[in-house]
Structures are given as C-alpha cells and as structure tokens.
C-alpha cells in the first residue's frame, strides 16, 4: 500500500491560500447549469468530487469551458438536454443527492451509481420525498441506497413535501435546489422537515447560493421552507467560490499545535460556511485566534500549561470540522467529548468507528458511542503509528496533525485527499518544521 511518512515536527507557521469550497463548488456548478445565461465561476475547486460533477454535467449536455480554477458554464434554462445518461459519481454526496433530485423532474431515463461505499450511503429519505411529487425512482440493488434508476414521470405538487432531516442535510439541499423547476398552481412549494435537522449551516449555504441565482427561499425555523415554483434560476454573471472552511481546520489546528503564527486566507467572518465555527471551538480549547473578513490566524495556545484545554461540545453544526477537534484532543490537558456527531456514521466511511480505531493507535483512550466520541490523550504519543485512512480524505488530513506532537506518523493511502484537496500534504509540509 502506498504511504507517506510525516514528521517529527514541532513548529508550524506561515500563510496558506485555501482551495475553493467543495460544498459551494458543486452547488454552484449545478445552479449555473440549471440557470438562464452564462456564469463565470472563479476559484472553483479542482478535486475528485468536482470532476465527477463536471463529467456528469457534460454527459447531461451542459456546455462549459474550464481554464485552471475558472469555469464558464452555459445554462440550460432549467432543462438538462440529455434524455438518457449513465452517471458514475464516485463517492461524491454533493453530486449524487442534488443530481438525483434534478434528474427526477427532468423527464429522462438516467442511472446514478458510484463506488461501493456510495452504495452504502443512504438516499432513501430523498427518494421518498421525490416520490411524493410523482418521481419514478427505482433501487437497482438495496432498498434505500444507490445505484438508482430514474425514469420519466408526471411531476405534480399538491401538498407539502415531507423529508427527514436527521440523517443528512443533503436531502433537503437537493429538494430546495430542484423544486423551483416544478410548477404549482399556488406558485410555491412547501417542504416540511421531520426530526432534528442536522448540519444546518449547509442548508444556509444552499439558501444563500440560490438567492445569488435569483431564487429566494423563505425559512420558518428549521422545520418549514417555502420555495417559489415554476421559475428559472438567473445567472449572476460572475460568482467566486470562497475557500474551503473544512480544509481550513487542519491548518488552524496546526497553528495552535505548532505555535504559529499560521494564517489561512479565503475564509473569515464574512464566510457563508458554518465550518468557520471551528475557529470558535479552537478558541474554547485555549488557542490564540484572530479573524478578519476573509482570513483567520492562529498563534499557539494562550494558557499557562501550554496544552489545549479539553472541551465537551455539541458538534451537530460542524460535523466535518469536528473530526479535526478529535485529533487535536490528543494534545489537550484532559478528556475531550464530541457530541451529536451521528452523521459521521454515513459519511465516506463510518467516521466514528474509524476515528476511534486510529486514535487508539497513537495511544489515546477512546470511548465511541452511536453519536459521540470521548478522547483521553496519552502521556506520550505512540511514534510511527501507521494510520489507515479508509478512502476518506478527512481521516488522512486530520491525522497529519499527529506529526506536530514530535513523533513520526505514517499515513496510508495519502492520495485519498484528492477528493477535496489534492495538494494538501505539499501545503502542510511547506508550513511545518522540526
């Protein structure tokens, strides 16, 4: 198996410009494809997940030109041209869920599939919501999971659409982005969410981006959403993808563990991404954090003992960035508890199980529950631990931080970071010193 040996390091400092946000990139690509007019997208992320979205849009007849991190998309005025397509979408939830919804109302014959792990990630709640408006979607293998077959259907909305919110916020995102394309007599469609909506900031991203393309969603708490119906997205002309706040978390943590100053550029106070909340969690752990509109800087730890403070915190709002806290907990002066992270279990891997296994390899005592993780750091990190990454980009990036504990660490299958941040390790190594 291919591997990468890192460290030992004791310092981290410098400045890093973040790649574009994965969540924003794939949303903007689909919105631009559905819009009327031409959209120039800048700072578009170049990664496995954005490539599968672009490949899918190309197969669906969408015209675009890409040059570096700029992509010019010619919109289809709400009707994707291809009446038939077989779409391989890898393990990209940000492509599978929204495209399933968009194609369900497009009137064609489509197949959606991906890597084996994608066929283990649930999509049944989204399919149930789409079937409420007449969509014809069949499961090819296991009920509730891809691969999917989508067929032409008579779509009509005559009652509020109900969708569960406690498994993945991407189900709601997919419905919100698609429903403006469906005409109703009342001129609007209502979506009602059952259960506690997880990852609320990702829904806020969706709503903000839809507004940039001319569609305003009304939100009543997090339980009810009203979407205008039978209207077209309008291109904003130009739109810039802000830096990836989830990716920022690794560098911000490095600035705390390695003394800093370490600055990330591309996200800050003005960000529409919830994962900038990672900076607040890091401050609660005692890190020295300052923030501008589009930058965040960390300068080590501000307490007397020089270690991070342990925390007990609900991470429902920032589940991806919470993974970085789990590894930062190795450097805390006591036991850290991460709560309300049940969504980890249906991500690229079962992240609760994976995190517990790999933290144990470096000496931590870990208690893993259905939706929580309790991490007690060791007196001394175990050197030369070989970290398995489970084809999960975030596992690989998180555990690079172990090298800042003055011990070498081996990352197995390091190229899995290509899903969102292909040159992550080059950037990390440019900021770290023995």
Curated annotation (Swiss-Prot):
Pfam families: EPSP_synthase. PROSITE patterns: EPSP_SYNTHASE_1 (PS00104), EPSP_SYNTHASE_2 (PS00885). 3-phosphoshikimate binds at residues 22-23, 27, 168-170, 199, 320, 347. GO terms for molecular function: 3-phosphoshikimate 1-carboxyvinyltransferase activity. It is found in: Cytoplasm. Pathway: Metabolic intermediate biosynthesis; chorismate biosynthesis; chorismate from D-erythrose 4-phosphate and phosphoenolpyruvate: step 6/7. Its EC number is 2.5.1.19. InterPro entries: Enolpyruvate_Tfrase_dom, Enolpyruvate_Tfrase_sf, EPSP_synthase, EPSP_synthase_CS, RNA3'P_cycl/enolpyr_Trfase_a/b. GO terms for cellular component: cytoplasm. CDD domains: EPSP_synthase. Monomer. Catalyzes the transfer of the enolpyruvyl moiety of phosphoenolpyruvate (PEP) to the 5-hydroxyl of shikimate-3-phosphate (S3P) to produce enolpyruvyl shikimate-3-phosphate and inorganic phosphate. Belongs to the EPSP synthase family. This is 3-phosphoshikimate 1-carboxyvinyltransferase. It comes from Paraburkholderia phymatum (strain DSM 17167 / CIP 108236 / LMG 21445 / STM815) (Burkholderia phymatum). The gene is aroA.
């Amino acid at each position: 198996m291919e591997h990468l040996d890192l460290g030992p390091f004791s310092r981290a400092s410098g400045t890093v410009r973040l790649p574009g946000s994965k969540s924003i990139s794939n949303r903007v690509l689909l919105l631009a494809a559905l819009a009327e007019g031409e959209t120039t997208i800048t700072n578009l992320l170049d990664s496995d997940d954005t490539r599968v979205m672009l490949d899918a849009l190309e197969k669906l007849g969408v015209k675009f030109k890409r040059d570096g991190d700029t992509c010019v998309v010619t919109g289809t005025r709400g009707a994707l041209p291809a009446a038939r397509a077989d779409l391989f979408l890898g393990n990209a939830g940000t492509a599978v869920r929204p495209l399933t919804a968009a194609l369900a109302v497009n009137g064609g014959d489509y197949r959606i599939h991906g890597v084996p792990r994608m066929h283990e990630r649930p999509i049944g709640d989204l399919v149930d919501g789409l079937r409420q408006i007449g969509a014809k979607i069949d499961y090819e293998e296991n009920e509730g999971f891809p691969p999917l077959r989508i067929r032409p259907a008579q779509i009509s909305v005559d009652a509020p659409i109900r969708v569960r919110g406690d498994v993945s916020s991407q189900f709601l995102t997919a419905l919100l982005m698609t429903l403006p394309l469906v005409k109703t007599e009342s001129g609007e469609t209502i979506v009602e969410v059952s259960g506690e909506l997880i990852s609320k900031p990702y829904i806020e991203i969706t709503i903000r981006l839809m507004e940039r393309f001319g569609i305003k969603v009304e939100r009543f708490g997090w339980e009810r959403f009203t979407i205008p119906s039978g209207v077209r997205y309008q291109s904003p002309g130009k739109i810039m993808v802000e830096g990836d706040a989830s990716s920022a978390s690794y560098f911000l943590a490095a600035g705390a563990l390695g003394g800093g100053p370490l600055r990330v550029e591309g996200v800050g106070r003005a960000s529409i991404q919830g994962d900038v909340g990672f900076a607040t969690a890091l401050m609660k752990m005692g890190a020295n954090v300052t923030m501008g509109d589009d930058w965040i800087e960390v300068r080590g730890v501000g307490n007397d003992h020089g270690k991070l403070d342990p925390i007990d915190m609900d991470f429902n709002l920032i589940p991806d960035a919470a993974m970085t806290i789990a590894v930062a907990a190795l450097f805390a002066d006591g036991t850290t508890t991460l709560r309300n992270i049940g969504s980890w279990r249906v991500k690229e891997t079962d992240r609760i199980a994976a995190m517990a296994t790999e933290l144990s390899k470096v000496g931590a005592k870990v208690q893993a529950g259905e939706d929580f993780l309790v991490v007690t750091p060791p007196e001394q990190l175990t050197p030369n631990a070989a970290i398995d990454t489970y084809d999960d980009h975030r596992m690989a990036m998180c555990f690079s931080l172990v090298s800042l504990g003055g011990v070498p660490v081996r990352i197995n299958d390091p190229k899995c970071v290509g899903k969102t941040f292909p040159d992550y390790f080059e950037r990390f190594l440019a900021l770290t010193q023995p």
